[in-house]
């Protein structure tokens, strides 16, 4: 359990960084597909 408590924040931080980066890149190349009126 101790190993999970030390690993989980690192995995979460990497996951959120990757997700944010993918969304930013997608929004840069396809700005009209992300936001529909």
Swiss-Prot record:
Keywords: Membrane, Photosynthesis, Photosystem I, Thylakoid, Transmembrane, Transmembrane helix. GO terms for cellular component: photosystem I; plasma membrane-derived thylakoid membrane. InterPro entries: PSI_PsaJ, PSI_PsaJ_sf. It is found in: Cellular thylakoid membrane. The keyword Glycoprotein does not apply. GO terms for biological process: photosynthesis. PANTHER family: PHOTOSYSTEM I REACTION CENTER SUBUNIT IX, PTHR36082. May help in the organization of the PsaE and PsaF subunits. This is Photosystem I reaction center subunit IX.
